[in-house]
Amino acid sequence: MRTHYCGHLNREHIGQTVTLCGWAHRRRDHGGVIFIDLRDREGMAQIVIDPDTPEAFKIAESVRNEFVLKVVCKVRARPEGTVNLNIPTGEVEMLASEIEILNPSLTPPFMLDDDNLSEMVRLEHRYIDLRRPAMQKNLMLRYRVAKVLRDQLDSQGFIEVETPMLTRSTPEGARDYLVPSRVHHGQFFALPQSPQLFKQLLMVSGFDRYFQITKCFRDEDLRADRQPEFTQVDIETSFLNEEEIMTIVEGMIRTMFKQVQDIDLPNPFPRISFAEAMNRYGSDKPDMRVTLEITELTDVMKDVDFKVFAGAANSAGGRVAAIRVPNGAALSRSEIDAYTEFVKIYGAKGLAYIKVNDASKLNEEGLQSPIVKNIHEPALKAIIERTGAQSGDIVFFGADKAKIVNEALGALRTKIGHEKGHVDGRAWAPLWVVDFPMFEHDEENDRWVALHHPFTSPKDGHEDLLASNPGAALSKAYDMVLNGWEVGGGSVRIHKQEVQSKVFDALKISKEEAQEKFGFLLDALQYGAPPHGGLAFGLDRLVTLMAGAESIRDVIAFPKTQRAQCLMTKAPNEVDEKQLRELHIRVRQQNPAA
């Protein structure tokens, strides 16, 4: 039907007769000559229709935006003064001899070049939204990323194996999406949150190197970087330690960035421990482009008169820390108030600060803040020296439980860093975070929970801590972070049943519960399971970063909203009563007063 894509035509095609198919992006009448910008996925071509071809001219007069056209035309150079070097086809235009309307179009709900569209309108008419060049560029980037990753894995001996979409529910983290069984009354499948257990079983089966680009499902509260269904590049290997796995994966990502976007990532990626990341940056996924750091002050605040600081410094699990912002003394009261409200999102009760007007004067004359009079001089000296504060700076403080301080100051560090230009100028800052704790403490239920998942292996020499001091046990886990986003996470897995049982004991998972939920894995570990480990990448997150998109919804063809709805298909929806009866399900009506 066509001989060329619109966006592929250039000076080399001058004199050729070509057939193009696409959508009328824009139609213009100029002094008896009609111009149509014809668009397909590869770009735009300018079609010229003059009265010398009366039949084509008559049809062109009736063309409106988004009509689907087939055009036979001759490629010629654009007249002098009309060349547009901003587009690949800008040196040529196409003189039409024949036009056929393959399908007319209603007036679209929005113009494709409207940059102020409501996302709700875009998602409701996604099939129109996906015609926008920016969206097509994003999805083609996604395809190229997936293809290069697949080719890289194939070249290194990885085998692509599909794992089940219908599996059993083992709710340890987020809620499962449940699928009722019609055949087995009262029983349910679950959609997988990850292929974790199946890929471990493939290693037990001897496949050695596995990968899969697969959908995963989590029924959780949504954020800008979350979707109820998401795509994961899933990898598992046998007989490799964490260093070898990280080397393979890092090389794969470095090659992919180079091939897809001609970006040179550092070799090797920097590494820091989880403890260092939390202490210095308040996050296990720090944006290393931001130059601000968190400074520890707990030890010097134990005997100050300011009770907020002293209370946190003397309480078990408390922390007092600070961020110095160069030239921050110029911040207005309203800006400081806005930052105070921001940290409250993370549980902070407020945001103390000191404006450093004169760093040489450790009193209220040199340091401007209501809290200065309640902090003795040795502590003030420690604040200035440890943070490196200079005249004209501001120092923000966090004082609370360490978890709250880390999250609040970590988020504030990133926010101020980007808003006030405290970044180092790098476009890309990859990082490995290693030496994660095995567990974190759930204070509400007074129990340990797995920081990653319960199948992560403890570091060598930490196995005995599983029973004696679970909070001190470190794991063979590693996360790849890029510009403050966790794009990949993995670990060496437990391959011995007795070690897996010790982890379940630390998590207060009884032998009966472990056998009920994970009996198939525990059984498999008794039949010569090899040492194994792996990693999974969030493809959506990775492409979002590479595309410079604001949300992962911009790199997914048909995403859900933040309320987990598809506005286009109106999913989820009510189903027929007959379908529910076949599944032995009754919908209980919600009581608005309840």
From Swiss-Prot:
Gene3D superfamilies: Bira Bifunctional Protein, Domain 2 (3.30.930.10), GAD-like domain (3.30.1360.30), Nucleic acid-binding proteins (2.40.50.140). Residues 196-199 are annotated as: Aspartate. GO terms for cellular component: cytoplasm. It comes from the Bacteria. One of its GO terms (biological process) is aspartyl-tRNA aminoacylation. The record marks 30, 81 as: Important for tRNA non-discrimination. InterPro entries: Aa-tRNA-synt_II, aa-tRNA-synth_II, aa-tRNA-synth_II/BPL/LPL, Asp-tRNA-ligase_1, Asp-tRNA-ligase_1_N, Asp/Asn-tRNA-synth_IIb, AspRS_core, GAD-like_sf. ATP binds at residues 218-220, 227, 486, 538-541. Its EC number is 6.1.1.23. It is found in: Cytoplasm. PANTHER family: ASPARTATE--TRNA LIGASE, MITOCHONDRIAL, ASPARTYL/LYSYL-TRNA SYNTHETASE. Homodimer. Belongs to the class-II aminoacyl-tRNA synthetase family. Type 1 subfamily. Aspartyl-tRNA synthetase with relaxed tRNA specificity since it is able to aspartylate not only its cognate tRNA(Asp) but also tRNA(Asn). Reaction proceeds in two steps: L-aspartate is first activated by ATP to form Asp-AMP and then transferred to the acceptor end of tRNA(Asp/Asn). This is Aspartate--tRNA(Asp/Asn) ligase.
